């Protein structure tokens, strides 16, 4: 007897790196909003979250070695060599640039954790984009990653250039939504 998860191809190991980053973001948000947590604890939590992401990428290698190239979540997420290489690249960039973006975000004083949360959200969107098998999932991953970067560009509200960059990226990025939607109108009308 097959279960619903087997029919739909649900396997959480495939999206585990994205889920690990989102879990790290939720813990950092909790530490920022509800309780006053020292910066070294937030730095430790984010570093452990990045290591957990790298571990889940390692688990994806094991799944790939047992199942080979496979499709999951009703052909929305693809596990192949290119997705694994992309996941490793994003994970290594997160690991090796962790200290530098922590030091850079300290220049914004009170918004250090917010900058780190936006960077991790952007990375989770790009991980989802790398694993996408169809264009809708690719677009969702791109939007998660890019909206976080738009907010990151405008994080320093006291700087006029930061506000200008955020507005410019936001307006140019919104064109990505308007244009695909307007190009689908003839398709929807024809059935």
Regions found by a protein language model. Give the residues of each.
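Alpha-helical transmembrane segments of multi-pass membrane proteins predominantly involved
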Residues: 1-191
